[in-house]
Amino acid sequence: MSIVSQAEQILDRVRAAGAEGDLIIDQGEALSLKAKDGALEEHKVTSSQVFGLRVIKDNRVGTAYSEAADGESLVALVDQALLNASYAAVEAHEKILANALKLETQDAQLSPIDQATVAEKIELALTIEARLAAKPMVKNVPYNGVQDSVGERRVYSTTGLEARSKARMMHCYAYALIESGDKNAMEGIGQAARRFVELDPDRLVDQAYQNTFDILQGAAIPSGKYDVIFDEEILPSLFNVFSMMFSGKSAKDGVNPMRDKLGEEIADSKLTVRDLPLDTDGFGYALFDDEGTPAQALCLIKEGALSSLIHNSMTASYFNSASTGHGTRGPRSTLGVGLHQLEIDAGTADDAALHAGAYLVVTDLTGLHSGANPISGEFSFGASGYLC
């Protein structure tokens, strides 16, 4: 039975029970390779498929999932979701959207056919480990790998929605352990691309080694006030820690300190932050959210002022607003909200002004979650980088 036929079978049973619902079907395939001491340590091939159903009946929401796809299991999936709904509290704002759109991403762009052989990927894994291990003072390369993964998501609903997205990611990474006397350090870096040929092992090895060597030679700097520039790899992690400030769900739950600050200045007037889900250069690209709402660009902070929160259909209903296309839900999880991919507008300072005087380039932060309180905004992180 085809995926479409299975979805129809599930949703027909939901309708027959007098309920409405939506169904997420996730499928994935992955290849994972790791090297150790010049030999292949891991060659893992995995595949997965999971059905995740949400039903709403009498304003009560129930969810259930199944990794099995036989007819009996799919019947049980519907029955379990309906049973769970019968015990749930009433949620007046959570509905299945009246959305009959047909949405589909472009496979040729986001999930291109892989021209590289498994042998070539194995050779890449061995090459990365060998080249990094051969660098001066490198004791070993404890963490390294080459991965090729393809993920596909389909979303169907009782109102006629049919949405499909598919994406491929090639990923390689390496961490070096360097020892010199009684000092040691371990650092690394990774790369991601949609095509195997876009991976650059020479650059990966050189950067991983240089990062580790620099940390080995590093020392604490005197306490004081420093101008700070965040490395482009660490800045997204910092923003992610405080992403709750944009959440319509946390605002609904009463734990978002920005709930009543729309239109107010909350940051430097030079800062403009946007969520750009339709930028195909990023791996956060999304044509639609997990409710099937079309994704669109959204300005979150405009010249320092909070301009929008992100909403799914439930939080939008609660605030008498419209969904911004930021609904999140997995086959095993309930409805939430989440960002796609943030972009900061370019500033006006030129390089000369930006790098004038002493400044600290932060390349790593530790304690990002344990050291941060996204409600109060207080934080205390360990930081490392370069004093320039």
Where are these predicted regions, by residue range?
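Active-site bordering "gate/hinge" segments
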Residues: M1-Q296, K302-A305
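Dual-mode signal for accessory low-complexity, basic/Gly-rich regions
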Residues: K261-C388
